[in-house]
């Protein structure tokens, strides 16, 4: 009876088209702040639950019935169940006694909190079991999180089976699930149709309720709230994320890390980097997952990296028991089953590789696959919506947690329908059709899609090219580039900028040489080799990354006090005025017509998206939205560019005539100033036409249009370059925030994130250098940590792996500066007298030692 889940095959084109119709209508409702289609909120009035048949259990079970205040979600009702607080349960009001195999009738209204999954009973349903019950409604706990399964299982009711209708020789059972009601409502069919079961109208109305002040922006905030708390799937989980919370490994190399276990690509592999016979993969399983088969992908061509003997352990915490011991055929290329037919949920499964072929020291695994029978999922937890959790979401604060919970349930249903058809819409759907454009209007909702990550990965794989047969070698003079950066007016053509030197160096030398297409596999992580003139360096990646960082700094300087050495971007008015939000941002220069270089910038952005490198461009959401194809608006997006102008026009719109004439007199004409300080006419001859009070609405409209479109051509050129490297389907599937993060990296460099990415080699755990190092980084600002990251790795944003070794002086206290090798992302850490000295030396090195000292070698050309 269940409708198709995400990614499942739909029964017919009719069902597919019906769901597309539904999505289009729902998207329009969301944008307009209207109630969603009623079919999405369907709740049956009656569901029959049967007591789970456990032969080892008692023949009779008492099921406690709890009373809930109001609708069952009240903040501050500590101990109340169900509710938004999941503290100790207070005493139940009554109990229902059932024999094993007996049934209880409930409504279809459900609620999930920290105690588990609850279902609601009406007064009539309670009376079937309790003759003197005084409750108007009650709640039964169907499933606890720790049980790994439901004590009560929903089934078809006998009444439903008796009411089956014989229509055209087909038995039509009344439809119970909301997915089926959506299909019935929006799929056209000839002849008689199944009918939905009797609806629980009160529950449906509660789900559909939209507060009077609710807007589409509130829904977007709710989606981001859910994503922050639920939706950030571990990027390393890939193909097993529906079963696994997280994957940990004993060790890994930077290039062949844990993500390779689940990328569904047999050409990649996880490779350990540790001691012999101490390799393991630990899976933290999602609640309710029971493993039917656990498979490892191996390849005999890995020689002595191939696992020979694997032992699997499982259980809770540190209490793991041996489950299987498997010897692997040394000639195998493919999957080997190392665990099967489990009957209970195991929170932790640990795969230990105890022996490799030919006594190999390290191991390679090309994949982990799981086949599972998922027990009933508990659903969205109502406890999430406590006021303390909503501080970062002002639009949601003050809204009843009960309303937020039910709205979130409805949005999750919408996402489930979207997931079921997403692979039909992208990339094959005609983008000119209205339906697709309507769905794109709610792109932020894709954050919660389970199908999207695999679709993005597949689109990128399908469009990638082979890596170049040779690596371009570029000769870069950074001394001239530094002189240009200090005084750009001496070099108006910007020939000495690193950006220009790289651009010219990558041009094909003759008509037969193909230009770089930047669509390489992710593992091709050095796009060109740099020879820095008058600097000794063997570039194994560090010099290349430094050139990207230099170009980023030239395009969008991080300091507001330095001139902008290239003409492609200009500082926003907010940065110049020191007002409003996003005061460190840049926008494309409306006066710059060098569209070929804008296109190349777009190609570099696409290459960064495909690979592991970053091109850090400080652009506001106003620009990223245009690049990703999202709609921009004056009120939402332009305050990040020129907040003073936005406020001025807002005041002008509502001002009276006397105030307007006093403030503007005859000085305001039909002109406006663009971001590059260029004055443009809004109408022909606008310089000489005064704006009268009656003309102000037209003037405001013209200013908004001119400013919103001021860099339209430049953005279009960047997008054209981006689309040469990244398929349109990928941009359709990514939100603008995700596009920015994939191109630029994570601007927030936290100590917690650095701890996960930092590895100490040849240090004792008690070494004071380790303690001083973390104390120093804790005292750093985010800018300090970003500078430090670049000093060590050549990257200024995360993620970036760091390896730390003792310096050559060992334990001798010194005041020497730390050294780094960006090619290997290595820091050589001296022994300092105190954490304060360590902090000072690290900070000085981060800001003043950007040259690659330890990569030096004699070089003469």
From Swiss-Prot:
Matches recorded under InterPro entries: APC_su10/DOC_dom (IPR004939), Galactose-bd-like_sf (IPR008979), HECT_dom (IPR000569), Hect_E3_ubiquitin_ligase (IPR035983), HECTD3 (IPR042469)
Reactions performed catalytically: S-ubiquitinyl-[E2 ubiquitin-conjugating enzyme]-L-cysteine + [acceptor protein]-L-lysine = [E2 ubiquitin-conjugating enzyme]-L-cysteine + N(6)-ubiquitinyl-[acceptor protein]-L-lysine
Keywords per UniProt: Acetylation, Cytoplasm, Phosphoprotein, Transferase, Ubl conjugation pathway
EC number of this enzyme: 2.3.2.26
Pfam family, one: ANAPC10
Any one of the GO BP annotations: proteasome-mediated ubiquitin-dependent protein catabolic process
Protein purpose: E3 ubiquitin ligases accepts ubiquitin from an E2 ubiquitin-conjugating enzyme in the form of a thioester and then directly transfers the ubiquitin to targeted substrates. Mediates ubiquitination of TRIOBP and its subsequent proteasomal degradation, thus facilitating cell cycle progression by regulating the turn-over of TRIOBP. Also mediates ubiquitination of STX8.
Protein name: E3 ubiquitin-protein ligase HECTD3
Classification of source organism: Eukaryota, Metazoa, Chordata, Craniata, Vertebrata
Gene that specifies this protein: Hectd3
